[in-house]
UniProtKB/Swiss-Prot annotation:
InterPro entries: aa-tRNA-synth_I_codon-bd_sub2, aa-tRNA-synth_I_CS, aa_tRNA-synth_I_cd-bd_sf, Lys-tRNA-ligase, Lys-tRNA-ligase_SC_fold, Rossmann-like_a/b/a_fold. A motif ('KMSKS' region) lies at residues 280-284. It comes from the Bacteria. A motif ('HIGH' region) lies at residues 32-40. GO terms for molecular function: ATP binding; lysine-tRNA ligase activity; tRNA binding. It is an enzyme of class 6 (ligase). Belongs to the class-I aminoacyl-tRNA synthetase family. PANTHER family: LYSINE--TRNA LIGASE. This is Lysine--tRNA ligase. Signal peptide: none annotated.
């Protein structure tokens, strides 16, 4: 039977390719050389979705996330203060670079903390592995010795995809000088036991004992497959750059076999672009969109939905423009289908329900969450001037167990209006009454008739009733309906257009409507 979701497909593939196991290990990781952006998050959530699918099939899963923080600091991001100071740390391990924003921790750790803080909000709780501690505590000493003893095999594996071959005096390690802390070093000799001799551009020369030194690490193309074997990784995806022909994944598949391991099940995930915000995703430039930024506009459920509803090998955009409304509408439809409020063809229902399940940070609630369209909510937020208590009081039949998610959605709407909504979407109810042109007598009469109709019928009139009455009154007073609408908007919000007028009036309420329009009739 066809699986309901791509994550379920890969869960089945892992079990088939790796055989029955008491524990399956899935992995992700990144170098925290800058803000961990939403493109990096795609890998993390892809692994989380597969981990959930494995768990749902009855398997035990270990989800590890490696901070590759013993990598070299190669470039100063443009958004970091004290650029000159940071330049002095180039070529050192990024764990040694200070965080010039907080001055409380290292640059790498600050980036890690920022990312770790938001993952549980979207239901992701991996086991974090600090690779700098692994190396400096000697955890990989035997793996380093193994690599040095298999130098020729590793060289051949790397050369298979290189245009310029490695030199004969190449060694499968890099060394941070113990004097200047930089990796500007050359390995001069290995005694085939535990001693490595090196020299540094700073003039330092010495021998290191593999078993006790903090300064030796494996280069990334060897380190990655070494850890596949060390952690017994069963699944790890990678971006299209790593999966290109002859790329790092092809090399690593061969190198892990030298370490007497096997490559994990994998897939290629594509890039993410940003729509309605501008700027290219780049950690080194500092112009990035982080998970925190996305959660300002999208609730945790909808954030997960963006990824769960898209195949990983498909490029897609995360929108901050008017498409936000459509994305929320799509999510709400999946929610209605999941809870049986809306029906679709049976062959689609299973897939829709599975996407909804995987979109939840934790377990789906027993009853359907309170539903309100994002466009409608955005109007309500502006009418009540972003006062959450007033918004909740206006909305009807909100149950206590629905409030938290609803409040989160309200906050996202408020943030979106403030930061990203187009100007013609924004409004505020008129509070000053000195900037409107004098209305003609027939317009004053028409607005007065509308006010009287509303005062008599407001509680029972539907939006359609109000809409019909506006058209009727405009025609009876020889006013073009388009002009009459424009005049009412101008009175209410000092703009020539706005939200759908009948619904807008219903939300404002008769008292506020009368208070404003009575100044002009």
């Amino acid at each position: 039977m066809k699986t309901a979701h791509w994550a379920d497909f890969y869960a089945e593939k892992i079990k088939k390719d790796k055989g029955p196991k008491n524990l399956y290990t899935v992995a992700s990781g990144i170098t925290p050389s800058g803000t961990v952006h939403i493109g990096n998050f795609r890998e993390v959530i892809s692994v989380d979705l597969v981990a959930r699918a494995l768990k749902d099939s009855g398997s035990k899963v270990r989800f590890i996330y490696s901070w590759d923080n013993y990598d070299v600091f190669r470039k100063v991001p443009k958004n970091m203060p004290e650029q000159e100071l940071l330049t002095t740390y180039l070529r050192q391990a990024i764990t040694r670079v200070p965080d010039t924003r907080s001055h409380k921790t290292s640059y790498a750790r600050a980036n890690e903390i920022e990312f770790e803080k938001y993952l549980p909000i979207v239901g992701i709780n991996p086991e974090f592995i600090d690779q700098s501690k692994q190396y400096t505590n000697g955890v990989y000493a035997s793996q380093i010795k193994f690599a040095l003893n298999h130098k020729k095999e590793l060289s051949n594996a790397l050369n298979e995809y290189r245009t310029s071959k490695l030199e004969e005096n190449w060694y499968p390690i890099s060394i941070f000088c113990t004097k200047c802390n930089r990796d500007t070093t050359t390995v001069n000799n290995y005694d085939n036991h535990y001693s490595v001799e090196y020299s540094c551009e700073c003039g330092n020369q010495e021998s290191l004992d593999i078993r006790t030194t903090w300064a030796i690490k494996l280069p990334w193309r060897i380190d990655w497959p070494m850890r596949w074997k060390y952690e017994e990784v069963d699944f790890e995806p990678a971006g299209k750059d790593h999966h290109s022909s002859g790329g790092s994944f092809d090399t690593s598949k061969n190198i892990v076999k030298i370490f007497q391991g096997s490559p994990p099940v994998t897939f290629q995930y594509d890039f993410i672009s940003i729509k309605g915000r501008g700027g290219k995703i780049s950690s080194s430039s500092g112009d990035v969109i982080s998970l925190k930024d996305v959660l300002e506009v999208y609730t945790p459920e909808v954030t997960r939905f963006l990824f769960a509803s898209t195949r990983p090998n498909t490029e897609f955009s995360i929108s901050f423009d008017l498409d936000v409304i459509k994305i929320y509408e799509d999510y709400d439809r999946f929610e209605r289908i999941y809870y049986g409020v809306e029906d679709i063809k049976e062959e689609k229902k299973r897939a829709f329900k599975r996407i909804y399940e995987l979109s939840q940070p934790y377990m789906p609630s027993k009853r359907i969450p309170y539903q309100i369209g994002f466009r409608h909510l955005s109007v309500i937020c502006q009418i009540f001037e972003n006062n959450i208590n007033k918004i909740l009081n206006y909305l009807k039949n909100v149950q206590e167990d629905q409030k938290d998610k609803l409040i989160n959605k309200i906050k996202c709407a408020i943030n979106w209006i403030r930061d990203f909504a187009p100007e013609d979407f924004k409004f505020s109810l008129r509070s000053k009454f000195d900037s409107i042109e004098i209305l003609k007598e027939n317009s004053k009469k028409a607005i007065n008739e509308l006010l009287n109709f509303l005062k008599k019928n407001f509680e029972v009139a539907t939006e359609q009733d109000i809409q019909n009455e506006i058209y009727k009154i405009s025609r009876e007073n020889n006013i073009e309906p388009a002009l009459f609408f424009k005049q009412i908007y101008k009175i209410l919000i000092d703009k020539e257009k706005g939200p759908k007028l009948a619904g807008f009036i219903k939300i404002i309420g008769i008292e506020r409507f009368e208070k404003i329009v009575s100044r002009y009739i």
